Amino acid sequence: MAFDFARATKYFLMWDFIKGFGLGMRYFVSPKPTLNYPHEKGPLSPRFRGEHALRRYPNGEERCIACKLCEAVCPAQAITIDAEPREDGSRRTTRYDIDMTKCIYCGFCQEACPVDAIVEGPNFEYATETREELFYDKQKLLANGERWEAEIARNLQLDAPYR
């Protein structure tokens, strides 16, 4: 058996240890890739699916025409809609509820809506203390729509070429 000088040199000089230490030092002095979350927030995609919202037209009228397509397409059966006819013959929603504990954020409701009434907005920070707060009624959904309308409209415009 012959003496392997190269292998012995690597072993005695702890070459693997030196390579590992160098790699660790390189990552130690490099900029950190993580964000300090509550204080720093990363960019969101225009296609991000967050908290649900009902939108209104610019004149203030509700967009929802009570076609119930979103209710029919929801795989989790999280949406409940009741409607009544208006004087002019069109329909109006009297009840629009979403059970956020059932919702799987698939976006089918948004895709099925012919008038872009129900959308999933940019808000992802809506933790609650009780389960009942995750049952969204029509007023809560309309308030979300009013709060996030500018960003929702911008995101829908950016996403329009892909729809």
Swiss-Prot record:
Under the heading PROSITE patterns, the entry gives: 4FE4S_FER_1, 4FE4S_FER_2
GO-annotated molecular function: 4 iron, 4 sulfur cluster binding; iron ion binding; NADH:ubiquinone reductase (non-electrogenic) activity; quinone binding
Q: Tell me which residues make up the 4Fe-4S ferredoxin-type domain.
A: 54-84, 94-123
State the EC number(s): 7.1.1.-
- Pfam families, alphabetically? Fer4_7 (PF12838)
The protein's location, in the record's own words, is: Cell inner membrane
Q: Name the domain of life this protein comes from.
A: Bacteria
Q: How and how many cofactors are bound, per the record note?
A: Binds 2 [4Fe-4S] clusters per subunit.
Report how it sits in the membrane: Peripheral membrane protein
Q: For [4Fe-4S] cluster 2, which residues are the binding ones?
A: 74, 103, 106, 109
Any one cellular-component term (Gene Ontology) = plasma membrane
* UniProt keywords, alphabetically: 4Fe-4S, Cell inner membrane, Cell membrane, Iron, Iron-sulfur, Membrane, Metal-binding, NAD, Quinone, Repeat, Translocase, Ubiquinone
Q: Which Gene3D superfamilies match?
A: 3.30.70.3270
Q: What class of enzyme is it?
A: translocase
**Gene Ontology biological-process entries:** aerobic respiration
- Give me the reactions it catalyses: a quinone + NADH + 5 H(+)(in) = a quinol + NAD(+) + 4 H(+)(out)
Residues the entry annotates as binding [4Fe-4S] cluster 1: 64, 67, 70, 113
Show the NCBIfam families listed in the entry. NuoI, PRK05888.1-4, PRK05888.1-5
The record describes the protein's role as: NDH-1 shuttles electrons from NADH, via FMN and iron-sulfur (Fe-S) centers, to quinones in the respiratory chain. The immediate electron acceptor for the enzyme in this species is believed to be ubiquinone. Couples the redox reaction to proton translocation (for every two electrons transferred, four hydrogen ions are translocated across the cytoplasmic membrane), and thus conserves the redox energy in a proton gradient.
Q: What assembly does the database describe for this protein?
A: NDH-1 is composed of at least 14 different subunits, Nqo1 to Nqo14. The complex has a L-shaped structure, with the hydrophobic arm (subunits Nqo7, Nqo8, Nqo10 to Nqo14) embedded in the inner membrane and the hydrophilic peripheral arm (subunits Nqo1 to Nqo6, Nqo9) protruding into the bacterial cytoplasm. The hydrophilic domain contains all the redox centers. NADH-quinone oxidoreductase forms a supercomplex with ubiquinol-cytochrome c reductase complex (complex III or cytochrome b-c1 complex) and cytochrome c oxidase (complex IV), which stabilizes the NADH-quinone oxidoreductase complex.
* Family the UniProt entry places it in: Belongs to the complex I 23 kDa subunit family.
Q: What's this protein's name?
A: NADH-quinone oxidoreductase subunit I
**Where does this protein come from, organism-wise?**
Paracoccus denitrificans (strain Pd 1222)
